């Protein structure tokens, strides 16, 4: 298995990268975030990789960080999510944003990814919720209480009252963890009222 490549970056295009390691050029498909993070063509780079072996092909996928690679692994562990779809998700959001969206139950964020339908987005949220990426150093990026029922119900209630999803989430993030939906809503409304 090829775990990482270190060498000269000889090609970078929307499909991925080619890294020259000791005279051998390895092509790896990569998300847009990796393409942006890597240095210019001709410079030395390190690409963390994941090899996928299929009946008809051996595919190499490259990432700028181990956290991205771990997020790729988490995505491809979900039924109906293949490597290409996982790259599309990582091109649309960072691993931290991905895990936060899953913790919040934000199906719309996943469904906005090109090629990802609503049912697959729901499956991603269901299977990724509660997971942590070890490469992130244990920080899930979501404060305590945000991924649970009362927080989610309060968010839905606030959007039902006419507040935008962004405004509701911003207010709820500013509130310390609460026991009930009603407590979340009251505290969030005070925050929103204080901003106006």
Swiss-Prot record:
Subcellular location, principal: cytoplasm
Function: The RuvA-RuvB-RuvC complex processes Holliday junction (HJ) DNA during genetic recombination and DNA repair, while the RuvA-RuvB complex plays an important role in the rescue of blocked DNA replication forks via replication fork reversal (RFR). RuvA specifically binds to HJ cruciform DNA, conferring on it an open structure. The RuvB hexamer acts as an ATP-dependent pump, pulling dsDNA into and through the RuvAB complex. HJ branch migration allows RuvC to scan DNA until it finds its consensus sequence, where it cleaves and resolves the cruciform DNA.
Residue span of region Domain I: 1-64
Lineage of producing organism: Bacteria, Bacillati, Actinomycetota, Rubrobacteria, Rubrobacterales
Alphabetized NCBIfam families for the sequence: ruvA (TIGR00084)
Any single Gene Ontology cellular-component annotation: cytoplasm
Protein name: Holliday junction branch migration complex subunit RuvA
Family recorded in the similarity comment: Belongs to the RuvA family.
Chain positions covered by the region annotation Domain II: 65-143
